[in-house]
Amino acid sequence: IAGEIAERFREIMVDEYQDSNEIQDAIFEALTADKQNCFMVGDVKQSIYQFRLANPEIFIEKYNTYSSAEKAKAGEGRRVLLSHNFRSSAGIISAVNDVFSLCMSPKMGGLVYGPDEQLQEGIPHISINEPEVSLYAIDVQNDTYAEESAFVADQICELLNGKHFVRDGENLRTVQPEDIVILLRSPSSV
């Protein structure tokens, strides 16, 4: 049956491959058996669906199986790294690289986050003469997280005071409320 279905497709493209599970991967394998027509895109750093049985080890196994695009032979599957980031500033890219270089290893995260895996700046840098990334450790004294909430509110007020800038295309403009996002571990953190 898989062979019959596979005949309908010239190419199989899988996005967010790092969030695939064993059943999904078996389907991809059945549909592409003995062919080089499966294109998978993923980033193990973005694997967030393990609670839905996603297995990032599947992605890592494929990542380690394929040769780099430069070393792969004709007709052979290859690994193409999309490392140029066209959305983020140099400060954000540097911070991401620093964090993941420290915390990713074969034992933690499944692979080494080395020079080949690190993000590269894809757009020209515009200096804004202030830190683009700030990390804070807040000593939370109780389960209400009131101190943390107050700190975040103060930081937002500071950003909106007209003295801080963000990139807007090739220009800079003052930070607006729609430029700010707060990431939470879970909705119950609100």
Regions found by a protein language model. Give the residues of each.
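Conserved helicase NTPase motor core
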Residues: I1-K62, L81-G91
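Short helix/loop segment immediately N-terminal to the Walker
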Residues: I1-R8, A72-G75, L111, L159-Q176
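Short, well-ordered loop/turn elements at secondary-structure boundaries
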Residues: E7-R8, E22, D34-K35, E76, ...
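Non-catalytic alpha-helical coupling and interface elements of nucleotide-dependent molecular machines
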Residues: V14, A33-Q36, N64-K71, N97-S105, ...
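Conserved RecA-like ASCE P-loop NTPase motor core of nucleic-acid helicases/translocases
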Residues: D15, V41, V80-H84, V152, ...
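Well-ordered alpha-helical segments embedded in enzymatic catalytic cores
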Residues: I23-I27, I58, E147-E158, S189
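Short glycine-/polar-rich loops that comprise or flank the Walker A/P-loop
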Residues: D34-N37, D43-K45, A69, K73-R79, ...
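Helicase-core coupling region on the C-terminal RecA-like lobe
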Residues: L81-N161, R167, L172
